[in-house]
Amino acid sequence: MVDPSGDPGERGAAGHTVLIAGATSAAGVAVAVALAGAGARVLAVGSNEKRLERVLEAVPECSVYVCDLTDFAAVTALAATVHAEHGPVDGLVHLVGGWRGGGGLDGQTDEDWDFLHTRVLQTLRNTTRAFNADLLASFTGRLAIVSSVSVDAPTPGGANYASAKAAAETWTRAVGHGFAKAGDTAAAVIFAVRSLEGLEPRLAAEVVALWDSPAASLNNTRRILAP
């Protein structure tokens, strides 16, 4: 039985149900492989069925779901399906993202902002709202997102992107404050990178390690991953 103190003890990620939102990227596949290797039940979610097949090739034992994570009704339906098939989740790893930018401040178009706001922030809002009760109910609930160091030093050409990531970090910290008010069993963690390319294995290892430490030592921390 998992320790209700929020300390996973020696079990780590084993036996936990972890949903990866945006699982079809290289980072998503790496995280899925690492979690499955650690004994977790992996639920891979993406918007493209063909790309989800690649996740299944890498992790045959995982369960895959096609969902438009920008649509809250679709996400709540996903949550209902997940609960019916697997019960509540213990972890949510949000990897939905994308890049739009360049051209200085004048190049920060409304179209690019809408794209970034929808993918980076709206999908995070939707998934955390749909699965927040699960993470609070779990003795070892974990939320992880990937942000950018550009939040710390934004440039005119990356203003849209940095703003969307900053908003995602703020949302995540708000979720973390909710976790803290409810007790010491759930944690929200931000991983910040300059570029995720080449860091996928490192990110995967860091995500798995979230179940190796007590929630109180992890909650609302921000970790910079560098090459």
Q: Language-model segments: which ranges?
A:
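Conserved glycine-rich cofactor-binding loop
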Residues: 24-26
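Conserved glycine-rich Rossmann-like NAD(P)H-binding loop of the short-chain dehydrogenase/reductase
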Residues: 38-54
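Rossmann-fold cofactor-recognition segment
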Residues: 58-73
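Hydrophobic positions on the long internal alpha-helix
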Residues: 78, 93, 123-131, 135, ...
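Conserved NAD(P)H cofactor-binding loop of Rossmann-fold oxidoreductase domains
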Residues: 95-102
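Catalytic loop of short-chain dehydrogenase/reductase
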Residues: 104-117, 125, 136-181, 192
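C-terminal helical subdomain
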Residues: 177-227
